[in-house]
């Protein structure tokens, strides 16, 4: 099984170890110090597929529409080379891109829908609130009112939360305003180029901190049970429809708390937000028909 992002394989590895205690599983990624040795089950980043030739009977590509896999012909070639000639490739994603959808419509790919999560509850739907001049308020060291209310609710409920922002330069502004308004909250920032990214995600997972302020790097592939999510500037162009659906998908993943809050804060609705809302509603309708 391969995924484009190291965060995903690091999260999946202990889960697979728990699910298949008798199986020896190789974990391969660019930061892994351990040399490769033959195992029946390999979990790796998609770049590691370049090391294999006709090796796998079944090759599963998780988050197939995500960066860097989606737009990288070399990684697509590596996928074909790594699978045995008579082997099977399975693509997993909650947000298939246009090319995959076209192949599905043309019956070039067999398609299966997993419309319900394992706990059987519907996907949490997106709530949009107006956030006029949110950047101007941050420059003055103040949190936008909807975000402040959201954080206050999390503190009162003693829940962890994620705040997504559109740009790296927004991270310190939100952090400073949050710490000034809610000094007791243990919060860090994280982004793709952060050298401590993996460690910070682990701190969140171990509940050593209350929140992460993040870019889209945590839009998919990470699970923090019971969290709520806010997206500041959800109408920014960086938030594609797929990214917004994936962000909403961070919520409600625990059977102990299958519901939760997905809050989008923005001056206005745009096409991507409307499409993300429609996609989640579509999946919930499809699940109710099963």
Residue map of PLM features:
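Conserved segment of the helicase C-terminal RecA-like domain
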Residues: 82-99, 241-244, 248-280
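Post-DEXD/H (motif II) to motif III coupling segment of the RecA-like Helicase ATP-binding lobe
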Residues: 54-149
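Non-catalytic, charged low-complexity extensions flanking SF2 helicase motor domains
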Residues: 276-290
């Amino acid at each position: 099984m391969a995924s484009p992002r190291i965060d995903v394989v690091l999260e999946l590895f202990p889960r697979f170890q728990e699910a298949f205690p008798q199986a020896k599983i190789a974990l391969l990624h660019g930061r892994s110090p351990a040399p490769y040795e033959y195992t029946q089950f390999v979990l790796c980043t998609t770049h590691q597929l370049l090391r294999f030739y006709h090796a796998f009977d079944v090759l599963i590509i998780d988050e197939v529409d995500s960066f860097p896999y989606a737009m990288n012909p070399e990684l697509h070639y590596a996928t074909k080379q790594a699978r045995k000639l008579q082997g099977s490739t399975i693509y997993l994603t909650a947000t298939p891109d246009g090319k995959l959808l076209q192949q599905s419509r043309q019956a070039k790919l067999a398609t299966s829908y997993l419309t319900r999560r394992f706990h059987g509850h519907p996907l949490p739907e997106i709530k949009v609130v107006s956030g006029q001049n949110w950047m101007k308020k941050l420059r003055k060291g103040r949190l936008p009112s909807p975000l402040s209310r959201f954080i206050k609710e999390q503190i009162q409920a003693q829940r962890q939360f994620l705040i997504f922002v559109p740009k790296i330069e927004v991270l310190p502004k939100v952090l400073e305003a949050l710490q000034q308004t809610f000094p007791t909250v243990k919060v860090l920032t994280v982004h793709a180029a952060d050298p401590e990214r993996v460690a910070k995600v682990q701190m969140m997972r171990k509940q050593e901190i209350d929140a992460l302020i993040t870019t889209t790097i945590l839009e998919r592939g990470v699970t923090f049970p019971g969290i709520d999510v806010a997206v500041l500037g959800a109408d920014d162009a960086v938030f594609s429809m797929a990214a917004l659906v994936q962000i909403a998908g961070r919520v409600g993943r625990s059977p102990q708390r299958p519901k939760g809050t997905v809050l989008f804060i923005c001056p206005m609705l745009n096409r991507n937000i409307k499409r993300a809302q429609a996609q989640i509603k579509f999946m919930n309708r499809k699940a109710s028909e099963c």
